[in-house]
Amino acid sequence: MIPKSHPRYESLVLRDKIVKAQKEGYLAESAMIAHGRGEAFDYLLGEKTTFPAKRAMYAAVATILLSENPVISVNGNTTALAIDEVIQFAKTVNAKIEINLFYRTDERVEKITELYKKHGYSQILGTKDDDIKYLKSIKNERASASKTGIYSADTVLVPLEDGDRAEILSKTGKKTITIDLNPLS
């Protein structure tokens, strides 16, 4: 039990969520490293949302609201850290949610699918039963895209992105919104 008085309480709660997700098998092994990297930048920024980041959030929401087919791309980290928030946001802005994993396995996809269903969201895309297409310019498992989701989306929100896929999505004419925890990228 983490005491709420701990100066890094919120950070430790998120860290526990990541560890739990790893144990449950829907988080890639390297996901803990990615989380730690993001956490380090958070410390450097003073654990505050910067003014430019707040402005970017407003612009991102406006872009999604003006889109005809917005999709939120989720992975294991996003699911572990913010599943309820992702679902609420998707419902609020009328966006679809699609599973898209760099280290894609049927087992991970099934576990993430079940988590979204348990949390009340049954229309999850990117499942093994979905009509999957492939984005030709991407040379890894993230090339998979639901025909009615990322493949045909006009706007894609990509939380926790390193940039390679976001760049390719943008080149295909999609508006691409990333939540990159690295302020230097």
What do the predicted segments below correspond to?
Residues 1-96, 107:
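Electropositive, gly/pro-rich neighborhoods at or near active sites that engage anionic ligands
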Residues 2-4, 157, 161-185:
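Glycine-rich, acidic loop regions that bind phosphate or pyrophosphate groups
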Residues 66, 151-152:
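Alpha-helix C-terminal capping/helix-to-coil transition sites in glycosyltransferase folds
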Residues 75-77, 101-104, 181-182:
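Short, ordered loop/turn segments at secondary-structure junctions
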Residues 88-142:
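Long, charge-dense
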Residues 89, 148-149, 167-169:
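Hydrophobic/aromatic ligand-binding patch that stacks against planar heteroaromatic rings
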Residues 132-151, 157-164:
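Active-site glycine-rich loop that binds ribose-phosphate moieties when present
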